Amino acid sequence: MAWLQIRLNSTDKYAEQISDFLEEIGAVSVTFMDSQDTPIFEPLPGETRLWGNTDVMGLFDAETDMQAVVSALITSGLVTADFAHKVEQIEDKDWEREWMDNFHPMQFGQRLWICPSWREVPDEKAVNIMLDPGLAFGTGTHPTTALCLQWLDGLDLTGKTVIDFGCGSGILAISALKLGAKQAIGIDIDPQAILASQNNAAANGVADRLQLFLAKDQPQALQADVVVANILAGPLKELAPNIMTLVKPQGYLGLSGILATQAQSVCQAYAAVFKLDPVVEKEEWCRITGIKQ
């Protein structure tokens, strides 16, 4: 069976409204694609994080009158009368199987593997974490997550306490626990991130050693041997006083979510308190690490 697809460009402001409208008039699915190869982080549960310039693609049954779809879009006021678009025929595929085939176990450092649940674990003796990829949470596919996982794998976490600041899916906290940490603490501003972390920790058998807090409920005088924060450069600089107090004396700090061009300004925010290591880059992103003096 073939399908008909309409593809049009939008801004992030209107993309979701266009998506909702296409579904209302019969689209069997709507997907978003980056129009300009702009970096974007893996969104949290319930969040649709869109690019500033987004292509919206609506898939319709082959019998659909696509001119009527175009006319309805114009009438809705969501697009201009002369909006650029493309209609094409799409051959049927097993879309779910094709999506699943794109994901394989990924190794980070020497010991750590992140595995989708439908894949066989490559090394039973390795530190294996089961997380399914999708829009709901980060699974290590983003370079900044990979940089943090590699760093954690290289530390001796035995008996240590780790704080995952901006925990999202909990992937970093869970990895730390599987790598030998005694306890991990996840902090995030989004209640859905807390829920995702709880579920993922339970699936990996470490829920009893993971404490989770919304940032507004973060305990006073909280400190850990290791603190990792994979958020954006702006918040890393703005929240530097708070993040620095979370690290015990002689403790370790790992920061990512930083473009390589932003590394110097982030380093300046922490250099007075930490002896910083050389910046590590991956693609256009980087990781900053150091020891509290």
From Swiss-Prot:
<dbReference type="InterPro" id="IPR029063">
    <property type="entry name" value="SAM-dependent_MTases_sf"/>
</dbReference>
<feature type="binding site">
    <location>
        <position position="166"/>
    </location>
    <ligand>
        <name>S-adenosyl-L-methionine</name>
    </ligand>
</feature>
<feature type="binding site">
    <location>
        <position position="145"/>
    </location>
    <ligand>
        <name>S-adenosyl-L-methionine</name>
    </ligand>
</feature>
<comment type="function">
    <text>Methylates ribosomal protein L11.</text>
</comment>
<protein>
    <recommendedName>
        <fullName>Ribosomal protein L11 methyltransferase</fullName>
        <ecNumber>2.1.1.-</ecNumber>
    </recommendedName>
</protein>
<keyword id="KW-0489">Methyltransferase</keyword>
<keyword id="KW-0949">S-adenosyl-L-methionine</keyword>
<dbReference type="InterPro" id="IPR050078">
    <property type="entry name" value="Ribosomal_L11_MeTrfase_PrmA"/>
</dbReference>
<feature type="binding site">
    <location>
        <position position="188"/>
    </location>
    <ligand>
        <name>S-adenosyl-L-methionine</name>
    </ligand>
</feature>
<dbReference type="GO" id="GO:0005829">
    <property type="term" value="C:cytosol"/>
</dbReference>
<dbReference type="Pfam" id="PF06325">
    <property type="entry name" value="PrmA"/>
</dbReference>
<dbReference type="GO" id="GO:0016279">
    <property type="term" value="F:protein-lysine N-methyltransferase activity"/>
</dbReference>
<feature type="binding site">
    <location>
        <position position="230"/>
    </location>
    <ligand>
        <name>S-adenosyl-L-methionine</name>
    </ligand>
</feature>
<dbReference type="GO" id="GO:0032259">
    <property type="term" value="P:methylation"/>
</dbReference>
<keyword id="KW-0963">Cytoplasm</keyword>
<dbReference type="InterPro" id="IPR004498">
    <property type="entry name" value="Ribosomal_PrmA_MeTrfase"/>
</dbReference>
<keyword id="KW-0808">Transferase</keyword>
<comment type="similarity">
    <text>Belongs to the methyltransferase superfamily. PrmA family.</text>
</comment>
